[in-house]
């Protein structure tokens, strides 16, 4: 199973939010490039970077920092946040991203996703952000009357192969991931799933790893790493156990 440390960017800093709320922000570092280097030195093989300013603004806002992270990291970097046009997507790829996560635009303009997949193939990932089973968009400030699994199936029909699945109610809470919802998404959505939100312990990682045969291929770790619940080395050992 793939373990991806998260670097969430706001105003050029490395932060974490609680359930996606700006007013519930914790600043972990003013030097996200150093943070990226640190995760790679500890064994990270991928990084997951989110442009929070971009998610709220509707267009990437931290491209210079993202490009610097990618140059410094030397490992593949998956980038999301505010990428709502083909132009923005191309800009993030030009900055060096290995994969790009499309969220809001996949709901509001799925034709963009279809074109992106035609051009870039598996470098295009969809972000499925779920609140009580419904899809959330625009930096999680709004929900739409679409079931998350139904949405995943639509994305699979467009040629998407992979999704980052976040249960917003668990994000940043350290309450454990929503295993039932993640299992349902992996079984029924037709996409490979990278799980995100609420992972608090090595046992949580083990539970997600048990879903590998059903399509859960990775986990994104944020607050649990930054708060020291466990080390990245420990997480990588759990992820590799039995592989």
Curated annotation (Swiss-Prot):
Gene Ontology cellular component annotations, sorted alphabetically: cytoplasm
Primary site of residence: cytoplasm
Pathway: Amino-acid biosynthesis; L-histidine biosynthesis; L-histidine from 5-phospho-alpha-D-ribose 1-diphosphate: step 4/9
UniProt xrefs under InterPro entries: Aldolase_TIM (IPR013785), His_biosynth (IPR006062), HisA_bact_arch (IPR006063), Isoase_HisA-like (IPR044524), Isoase_HisA-like_bact (IPR023016), RibuloseP-bd_barrel (IPR011060)
GO function term, MF aspect, one: 1-(5-phosphoribosyl)-5-[(5-phosphoribosylamino)methylideneamino]imidazole-4-carboxamide isomerase activity
Family as reported in the entry's similarity comment: Belongs to the HisA/HisF family.
Matching HAMAP family: HisA
Active site, per annotation: 8, 129
Protein localization: Cytoplasm
Protein name: 1-(5-phosphoribosyl)-5-[(5-phosphoribosylamino)methylideneamino] imidazole-4-carboxamide isomerase
Swiss-Prot/TrEMBL GO biological process terms: L-histidine biosynthetic process; L-tryptophan biosynthetic process
Cell membrane listed as a keyword: no
Keyword line: Amino-acid biosynthesis, Cytoplasm, Histidine biosynthesis, Isomerase
Gene name per UniProt: hisA
EC number in record: 5.3.1.16
Top-rank lineage group of the source organism: Bacteria
Reactions catalysed according to its record: 1-(5-phospho-beta-D-ribosyl)-5-[(5-phospho-beta-D-ribosylamino)methylideneamino]imidazole-4-carboxamide = 5-[(5-phospho-1-deoxy-D-ribulos-1-ylimino)methylamino]-1-(5-phospho-beta-D-ribosyl)imidazole-4-carboxamide
